[in-house]
Amino acid sequence: MKTFQLMMISFLFVAITTTSGVVSEGNDVVYDGEGDPVKPNVPYYISFMTSDYNMWICRMQYGSTDPNSCPQQPLMVTHPNLAAPTPVMFVLANKSDVVRESAKLKIKFVGPRQCGKSGFWKVVQRNSSEGEVFLNGSKSMSHNDSTFAIHKTNEYYKFTFGDGDYPTTISMTNDYPIYRLLSKRLSGEMEIYFYKNLTTSEG
């Protein structure tokens, strides 16, 4: 009888644990600035923290104000020209209809190829502990140099790079007013938010 009771208790514990796990997975959806779930293959603008800071991800050449100059890379730009912020789309490895935290994904600028490069973000390693985000990444999930994930911070979100046990955090340089994006261990994180359009974010 005791054995049967212990087995039932163990079964209930496993069932409760499993159910809790399913619930927690359902709560890790990434949300945009309007409170809607972020969806794959839908354009979003990326801001530093909230849109109040007026800092946006743009596809530009570092050090140039000409939007058509090459080479280009993802940059966080302070008070950019209204036409400069470039929306991105998140491409998932799975068939989910929403983007979830920690899910493997690719980040791709919306629009045609420019400067002869794909719009997919890619980390180029400078050394064993630091890399920089450029373009011409691959849409294939087998290419680790182009694999990112989104994680919740206290109030916003952040990007991490790599699908190993120790992903790096995407942070920004100190190059005001245009910041390059770095992939570094034990560094500050670039806290971000997502907006479907600039009109809503500015309103």
From Swiss-Prot:
Q: Name one Pfam family in it.
A: Kunitz_legume
PANTHER family registered for this protein in UniProt: KUNITZ TRYPSIN INHIBITOR 2 (PTHR33107), KUNITZ TRYPSIN INHIBITOR 6-RELATED (PTHR33107:SF35)
Q: Which cysteines are joined by disulfide bonds?
A: C70-C115
Any one Gene Ontology molecular-function term assigned to this protein's record: serine-type endopeptidase inhibitor activity
What the entry lists under InterPro entries is as follows:
Kunitz_inhibitor_STI-like_sf, Prot_inh_Kunz-lg
Query: What taxonomic lineage is listed for the species of origin?
Result: Eukaryota, Viridiplantae, Streptophyta, Embryophyta, Tracheophyta
Q: Which SUPFAM superfamilies would you find in this protein's record?
A: STI-like
Family as reported in the entry's similarity comment = Belongs to the protease inhibitor I3 (leguminous Kunitz-type inhibitor) family.
- Keywords, A to Z? Disulfide bond, Glycoprotein, Protease inhibitor, Serine protease inhibitor, Signal
Does the entry feature the keyword Chloroplast, yes or no? Answer: no
Provide the gene name from the record.
KTI6
Residues bearing carbohydrate: N94, N127, N136, N144, N197
Keyword Glycoprotein found: yes
Record's function text: Exhibits Kunitz trypsin protease inhibitor activity.
Q: Signal peptide location in the record?
A: 1-21
Source species of the chain? Arabidopsis thaliana
Protein name, UniProt field: Kunitz trypsin inhibitor 6
